[in-house]
Amino acid sequence: MTGPRVFKRSEMVLKPAVTPTGTTAIARVVDASISREMGAGIEYLEDATIDWTITYDEVLFILEGPLTIEFDGAAHECNTGDIVWLPNGTHLKYIAKQRAAYFYAVHPVDWAAKQGLAEP
């Protein structure tokens, strides 16, 4: 675990993520090497649909929208500045018909490793 840090956008490395449709890239800035509890980063989506059941608690802050998130039988259109709470076990679908981006914070940081998965 490390002390306080500032992550400069110019130093973030975007990595393509494996998805069934569209384009997505993730810059993970807080991972298990930095925190034992939380993870955080930025994800960019463009013309992408991701169907997923999360196995962690997550908070999203929409940086660029619109981004539609379907959960609990409804479609929620999220725009710049909106905040979304997604508890562990939520089945959802992210739909970005154009470029969208969000900051995410997750707990626990090692959700994928606990399930024997590589992070997407």
Residue locations for each model-derived region?
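Ligand-binding loop in jelly-roll beta-barrel domains
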Residues: 88-114
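General beta-strand recognition
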Residues: 51, 68, 77, 93, ...
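Charged, glycine-enriched surface loops/patches
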Residues: 77, 112, 117-119
